[in-house]
Amino acid sequence: MSKIIGIDLGTTNSCVAVMEGGSATIIPNSEGARTTPSVVNIKDNGEVVVGEIAKRQAVTNPTSTVSSIKTHMGSDYKVEIFGKKYTPQEISAKTLQKLKKDAEAYLGEEVKEAVITVPAYFTDSQRQATKDAGTIAGLDVKRIINEPTAAALAYGLEKKKEEKVLVFDLGGGTFDVSVLEISDGVIEVISTAGNNHLGGDDFDNEIINWLVAEFKKETGIDLSNDKMAYQRLKDAAEKAKKELSTLMETSISLPFITMDATGPKHLEMKLTRAKFNDLTKHLVEATQGPTKTALKDASLEANQIDEILLVGGSTRIPAVQEWVENFFGKKPNKGINPDEVVAAGAAIQGGVLMGDVKDVLLLDVTPLSLGIETLGGVFTKMIEKNTTIPVKKSQVYSTAVDNQPAVTINVLQGERSRATDNHKLGEFNLEGIPAAPRGVPQIEVTFDIDANGIVHVSAKDLGTGKENKVTISGSSNLSKEEIERMTKEAEAHAEEDKKFQELVEARNKADQLISATEKTLKENPDKVSEEDKKNIEAAIEELKKVKDGDDKSAIDSAMEKLSQASHKFAEELYKEVQAQAQAQQQAGANAGSDKKDEDVAEAEVVD
């Protein structure tokens, strides 16, 4: 049986590992390195070069070299090279193909199966895109697991005592924080938070922007529009960032960076760690919000965390380590390699799936709440965020109007009460619902999140058995603003959301009251006086005028008036029902029946 390899498909670098002799082994690539740059170059003859070689020649071939494609996973972005357009999945597949080939050379056998990691805050469409990339690369992706969880898996394999662990994962393009409980082989994710658009690339870009601005100040030349010069700046910025993790100052030297009428120009600058910290201060601060959110969702204080694991190459930045240490009051664990631990964890999960690793149970969670849009534009959550996966939940809903022939299931992801404030994953229709009064048809909606975190939604008419289902694979990922809105604004807008929820509930109650009252009037015209009927109809009209407005107190007041106007009518109906029941009981007694206790009086209750 062939091995299941573990792959960390990173924004900047990727890594592959496999279980050997009960532990995870990092597989070196064909160049002898333990990580492979996630860089792809495609030549005009179709030849593909991946990794360090592609990265080295990016300066001379910037338009045919692609890096950091992971930031576009799950979107409709395409990169055009020599007239051909490539999706992020296709480019990522080329990196995966190299990792697969290197693993086969190391193991001496064909590799067909893999566990691939993704950021914990990846959306459903981004997870699906990652799985698709694996398929394109010729891999059967047995499981998609979250990067922080994989890191904890590698860290916690031998741990027997109970610990609360926080994984701080700052990679090349994404940031995740996960809080986990590790105890006797069980690794349970309690909460997760993050930002899909924050990582090492952003730190590089700050250096690039500074270099461009300083060079323009000195020479008047703008390097940002020169693709070849920009690629050299990018390489120099990444190198300077890495050097400043150990040095207090670094020199950036780029001879012949450009030229003008006076001749060639050279870029020579010094960058201190203090200046770098100043340039990137806002990026370090951007990690604080998700960290606090993850702790809050786990109902823990910073001092209750037993161990902090730093994952991702960007956690080597001194300012990041300093903030983590100051916030938690303890030094983070530096005993793990931040570039390799995720791939090692993925390999361990592969071992679990093969049965080679026993007594390890991984319980992961979904990062955002999932649900559907219901009457009044409300987001009705069916699966709350931080719910352990895999999970399957069903809920029965009904139609909003009489004789409704179809329902549209609008699938959403987020934390806000108003449907439009959340991220839309997709929608589908369930048609052919038999004509019936509102509230009568029973539509069962089922959400099923598999172990990969991929969402499957179905809707079934319980009356006819008709069913429609969809695997959500949306075409757009969450922007930084959308993520911040979902995680931070939910709390800031809590009162606003509560008021909106109450308003929608009042509108729905008003609709129900109008419908029920009109129906009862129609069915019992001889049981209401002309005066009462006029009062009831006037109250109905008044409620209809205000029910779709934004004034909840006006709706409540109009409902109360309608209820008061209907009281006498309702009393008359109940009196008649009771009289009929008594008459039936009396008739039974007169007949000498001994089954009078079994008689049931049926009546329609009108609120």
UniProtKB/Swiss-Prot annotation:
Official protein name in the record: Chaperone protein DnaK
A GO biological process held by the record: chaperone cofactor-dependent protein refolding
Region span, Disordered: 579-607
Compositional bias (Low complexity): 579-592
PROSITE patterns noted in UniProt: HSP70_1, HSP70_2, HSP70_3
Gene: dnaK
Family annotation (Gene3D superfamilies): 1.20.1270.10, 3.30.420.40, Actin, Chain A, domain 4, Substrate Binding Domain Of DNAk, Chain A, domain 1
Family per similarity comment: Belongs to the heat shock protein 70 family.
GO molecular-function terms, A-Z: ATP binding; ATP hydrolysis activity; ATP-dependent protein folding chaperone; heat shock protein binding; protein folding chaperone; unfolded protein binding
SUPFAM superfamilies assigned: Actin-like ATPase domain, Heat shock protein 70kD (HSP70), C-terminal subdomain, Heat shock protein 70kD (HSP70), peptide-binding domain
Presence of keyword Chaperone: yes
PTM-bearing positions, type Phosphothreonine: 174
